[in-house]
């Protein structure tokens, strides 16, 4: 499998975990290091795996459903780093309210002995 295909699969795994609202799947996608970072729309920068994991747990506990259709997907690669940019077209149910929104996202992956792991997710509302 080519590196580009591995990155596409790693990115798809992130969105599968997100849609499943499954913290165990999300744990598998991410590196568990202090250098990981995450910015959810409207949230401050979260630093380190513990803070990032807690944020996903909170989101999953308060979300009834989350469905993604990705568009404008681009994959860029370096030697041991790769990044994916995309538009997340989201249908969600949070606190019994259904919403449809579009979010710009950047996902940065780092190659490790375990494969490509997410080290940075940044998602911002399109204004």
What are these regions (language model features)?
Residues 1-25, 35-127:
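A beta-strand edge to alpha-helix "cap/lid" segment located at domain peripheries
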Residues 31:
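Helix-to-beta-strand junctions that scaffold the AdoMet/dcAdoMet cofactor pocket
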């Amino acid at each position: 499998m080519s590196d580009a295909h591995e990155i596409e699969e790693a990115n798809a795994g992130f969105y599968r975990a997100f849609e499943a609202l499954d913290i165990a799947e999300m744990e598998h996608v991410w590196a568990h290091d202090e250098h990981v970072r995450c910015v959810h729309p409207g949230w401050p920068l979260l630093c380190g795996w513990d803070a990032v994991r807690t944020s996903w747990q909170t989101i999953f506990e308060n979300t009834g459903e989350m469905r993604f259709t990705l568009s404008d997907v681009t994959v860029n690669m370096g030697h041991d780093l790769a990044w994916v940019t995309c538009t997340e077209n989201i249908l969600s149910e949070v606190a019994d309210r259904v919403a449809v929104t579009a979010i710009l996202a950047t996902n940065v992956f780092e190659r490790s002995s375990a494969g490509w792991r997410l080290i940075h997710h940044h998602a911002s509302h399109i204004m």
